[in-house]
């Protein structure tokens, strides 16, 4: 709402709207901006100027928090607006949401990538001992867990590490040593953030990237958990380790979009509009 350059008259742009389902990215744009009162006032004034008393926000936890702030600010200034939050996050980490649009396609990408990288890894197993595939996900391991979807028999992944289960580095190294001795190579999938059994983060000193305006670490711009583990495995076990970090490819590769995810996104949009028409007052 802060940038009106993306406004579309749906009555005149049906072909454009239909093409969006197969287009990477978000036409409406995205933001990591920390919302302040000035932003809330700007949004409210733009809504009033447009004669609008309704707002649909699409996104994850940050978006939902901003929408809650918007409702409170409008009410405090004497305006009754209707606000709906439509879930959309590849991390699938919204409380109360079973599956958010975006997650299915990210899961499909990761499962396909792990399957195909594993085949390449096996071809190079004469000089690569360990492959570490780092996924997006922030504080949740849904994307990493999806790496098993195309697993067959003893194929990758051999080990999956998610933030929901704290990692004991000593035990992990012993498991890697054991699996390598047994099969000659180990394929590990790790979430971009992992909790350590000692109460900290795995490779915390390697998470040296910047933070966004909300104070959250931008893991994809740091040296990363995967690289930390690769270095650790090499230095302590003497096993040559490679770290793969596809990062934003997981949410941008249009050829990996899952059809159920596409359908879910459309249904979520329709449900948001339907819910908006059924709301009666501020805060609903």
Regions found by a protein language model. Name each.
Residues 95-107, 256-259:
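Short beta-strand elements at the ligand-binding edges of bilobed clamshell
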Residues 236-284:
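C-terminal active-site/capping subdomain that shapes the small-molecule cofactor and substrate pocket
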Residues 54-59, 65-80, 100-242:
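Accessory alpha-helical/coil subdomains and C-terminal extensions
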Residues 47-48, 80-83:
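Signature of multi-pass transmembrane helix bundles
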Residues 19-30, 88-98, 127-128, 210-212:
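Gly-rich Lys/Arg/Thr-decorated short loops/hinges at beta-loop-alpha junctions or inter-strand turns
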Residues 2-53, 62-63, 101, 108, ...:
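Glycine-rich oxoanion-binding loops at beta->alpha junctions
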Residues 1, 32-33, 60-61, 86-92, ...:
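Short, ordered loop/turn segments at secondary-structure junctions
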């Amino acid at each position: 709402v802060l940038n009106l350059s993306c406004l579309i008259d749906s009555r005149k742009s049906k072909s454009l709207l239909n093409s969006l389902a197969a287009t990477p990215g978000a036409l409406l744009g995205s933001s990591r901006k920390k919302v302040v009162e000035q932003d809330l006032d700007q949004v409210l004034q733009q809504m009033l100027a447009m004669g609008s008393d309704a707002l649909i926000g699409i996104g994850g936890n940050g978006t939902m928090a901003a929408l809650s702030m918007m409702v409170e600010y409008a009410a405090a200034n004497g305006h009754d607006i209707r606000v709906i939050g439509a879930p959309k996050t590849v991390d699938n980490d919204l409380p109360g949401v079973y599956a958010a649009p975006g997650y299915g396609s990210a899961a499909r990408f990761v499962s396909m990538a792990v399957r195909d990288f594993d085949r390449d890894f096996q071809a190079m197993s004469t000089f690569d001992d360990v492959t570490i595939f780092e996924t997006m996900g922030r504080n949740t391991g849904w994307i990493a867990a999806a790496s098993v979807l195309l697993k067959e028999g003893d194929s990758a992944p051999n080990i999956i590490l998610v933030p929901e289960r704290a990692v004991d580095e000593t035990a992990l190294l012993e498991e890697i040593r054991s699996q390598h001795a047994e099969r000659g190579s180990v394929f590990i999938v790790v979430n971009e953030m992992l909790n350590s059994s000692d109460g900290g983060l795995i490779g915390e000193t390697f998470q040296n990237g910047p933070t966004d305006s909300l104070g959250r670490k931008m893991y994809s711009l740091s040296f990363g958990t995967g690289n930390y583990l690769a270095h650790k495995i090499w230095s302590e076990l003497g096993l040559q380790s490679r770290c793969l970090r596809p990062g934003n490819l997981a949410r941008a590769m249009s050829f990996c979009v899952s059809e159920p995810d596409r359908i879910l996104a459309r249904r979520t949009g329709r449900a948001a509009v339907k819910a908006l028409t059924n709301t009666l007052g501020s805060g609903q």
